[in-house]
Regions:
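A residue-level marker of the well-folded mature domains of exported/periplasmic proteins
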Residues: 1-292
C-alpha cells in the first residue's frame, strides 16, 4: 500500500533518444510516443535527435543518466556502438527500453520491435511468387550496421534461396530515399533487364521508382518496400508507385505502455515482438493481410 501511495501524483521524466529524424518512419515514431504519453498527465518525455550520429546518441544517453531521468527510451542508430552506453544506463539503475534496433547482450530492460527476419522472408516469398521463381532483382539494403538492415536482408535471402531469382545489383542506401534513387540510377545504367526492386524501406522503394520513371522504365519494374506508414508506403501503393509493402510498427504506443508498467514496479517481457501486415494493391482496401 505504501508503494502504491508513493507513486500517486509523482511526475515521471522519460528521456527519448531518436537516432535520426531524417526518416519519416522515425518522425512518426516520435509522434506516436508523444500521443501515447499524452494519456498520462504525470509523464514528461524529453526528445532528442541524434541526427544520424553514433557519437551524439552515445552522448545523449550519458546526459540522460547524468540528469537523473526515470526511464530511457532509445532507438539506436547502430547495434554495437550503442550497446555500451545503454548497458551503463541500465547498470546505473535506470530502466532502458530499446526500440526497433537491438543491441548486443542483455543489459537493458525491454526490447520492442517486429520480427525483421520474418518480414524480409515474407517479402522474399511474395517476390518469388510474383516473379514465378525467376527474374532479375535490385536489392537496396537498409544500413547494414543495424539489426533491421541485416535481418531484412537475411530473411529475403532465405526466401529466394534455391530459386532462379538473381540479385544483380546490391547497394546500402542507408534508409535514405535520395541515396536509393542514386543507386537505382546506377543499376538502370548497367542493367537493361530489371524485373523488381526490393528495398529495405518504403522511401528506398519510392526513390527507386522515381529513378526508373525518369528514364521511362518504371512500368516494367515491380517495387517492394517495408514500413507501411499510411502517409508513406500505403499512399505510394494507392497511387501505383510501389506494388507491395510490409508494415513495421513504430513501437510508440507499445513503448509508453511498457514504460508506465516499469515505472510502477511491474514486470514486462524482456522482448516484445509486434505483428506485421502485408499490403498489396489487391488487399489495400481490406487493411492488408497479417503475416503468419
Amino acid at each position: 500500500m505504501a508503494g502504491k501511495s508513493a507513486t500517486v501524483g509523482k511526475k515521471w521524466v522519460i528521456g527519448m533518444s531518436q537516432c535520426t529524424l531524417a526518416e519519416p518512419w522515425r518522425v512518426q515514431m516520435d509522434a506516436d510516443l508523444k500521443k501515447a504519453a499524452a494519456k498520462y498527465p504525470n509523464l514528461k518525455i524529453i526528445f532528442k535527435d541524434a541526427q544520424n550520429s553514433v557519437l551524439k546518441q552515445r552522448a545523449q544517453i550519458a546526459e540522460f543518466v547524468q540528469s537523473g531521468v526515470n526511464l530511457i527510451i532509445v532507438s539506436p542508430k547502430e547495434t554495437a556502438p550503442l550497446t555500451e552506453p545503454i548497458a551503463k544506463a541500465y547498470k546505473a539503475g535506470i530502466p532502458v527500453i530499446v526500440l526497433d534496433r537491438a543491441v548486443l547482450g542483455n543489459q537493458y530492460t525491454c526490447f520492442i520491435g517486429a520480427n525483421n527476419t520474418a518480414i524480409g522472408r515474407a517479402a522474399g516469398t511474395w517476390i518469388v511468387h510474383t516473379l514465378h521463381g525467376k527474374g532479375n532483382v535490385v536489392e537496396l539494403e537498409g544500413s547494414m550496421t543495424s539489426s533491421p538492415g541485416q535481418e531484412r536482408n537475411a530473411g529475403f535471402q532465405q526466401a529466394i534461396k534455391g530459386t532462379q531469382i538473381h540479385v544483380i545489383y546490391t547497394a546500402d542506401m542507408k534508409w535514405q530515399q535520395n541515396i536509393a534513387r542514386r543507386e537505382m540510377e546506377s543499376a538502370l545504367t548497367r542493367f537493361p533487364d530489371i524485373n523488381l526492386v526490393y528495398a529495405a524501406n518504403d522511401p528506398g522503394a519510392y526513390g527507386a521508382y522515381l529513378a526508373a520513371k525518369a528514364v521511362g522504365r518504371a512500368k516494367k519494374i515491380i517495387f517492394v518496400g517495408i514500413d507501411g506508414l499510411p502517409s508513406e508506403g500505403l499512399a505510394y501503393l494507392a497511387q501505383g508507385y510501389i506494388d507491395a509493402t510490409f508494415r513495421y510498427p513504430t513501437c510508440g504506443r507499445h513503448a509508453i505502455a511498457a514504460a508506465w508498467k516499469i515505472l510502477h514496479g511491474k514486470k514486462v517481457p524482456k522482448h516484445i515482438t509486434l505483428s506485421s501486415r502485408m499490403f498489396t494493391k489487391a488487399n489495400l482496401k481490406d487493411g492488408g493481410q497479417p503475416l503468419p
